[in-house]
Swiss-Prot record:
It comes from Ajellomyces capsulatus (strain NAm1 / WU24). This is Cyanate hydratase. It is an enzyme of class 4 (lyase). PANTHER family: CYANATE HYDRATASE (PTHR34186:SF2). The gene is CYN1. The active site is at R103, E106, S129. Gene3D superfamilies: Cyanate lyase, C-terminal domain, lambda repressor-like DNA-binding domains.
Length: 163
């Protein structure tokens, strides 16, 4: 018996996702592929790959070729579905209802001002970019056998302009 955890999607519970999401997730489930395996095939980070599936990131022409190949989707169909620009941010209700997504929201809610204060002290007046940005998720296991999620955010610092 295989112990594979795969993220799937019930599109009926996510009416704001693009049509491409249903096609991508069905092929992912049919092929029993993790985002890690798909990301490795297309040469992208697994979070960036998942963002394409949710319509939150733009797939390049090369991404589309490789996604069609690994997922067994007709290239022309996938090119049509992924040809537009992402409509970012509309896929999740606010505040989020999913417990894990809500915890991420809660982290920013609870620690946002602390992050801001520390960043301002380290970098000055400005913001961390979410455009010149990368993120990754790693798994750590401590000495007691407890699993820990390590989420890294890396954003370019953008100082406010004086005018």
């Amino acid at each position: 018996m295989s112990n594979i955890n795969l993220a799937t999607l019930d599109i009926s519970e996510h009416p704001n996702l693009p049509t491409s999401s249903a096609v991508l997730f069905k092929a992912k489930a049919d092929k029993k592929l993790s985002f890690e395996k798909i990301a490795s095939h297309i040469g992208r980070n697994e979070v960036a790959t998942a963002a394409i599936f949710y319509g939150q990131a733009k797939a390049s022409a090369e991404d589309i070729v490789k996604l069609a190949e690994v997922l067994g989707i007709d290239h022309g169909q996938l090119e049509f579905l992924l040809s537009g620009f992402p409509d970012r941010g509309k896929s999740v209700s606010f505040p989020p209802k999913d417990p894990l997504i809500y915890r991420l929201y809660e982290i920013v809610q609870n620690y946002g001002y602390a992050y801001k204060a520390v960043m301002n002290e380290k970098f000055g007046d400005g913001i961390m970019s979410a455009i010149s940005f990368s993120t990754k998720v790693e798994k750590e296991t401590d000495n007691d056998g407890n699993d820990w999620a390590v989420v890294t955010w890396r954003g370019k610092w953008l100082p406010y302009s004086r005018f």
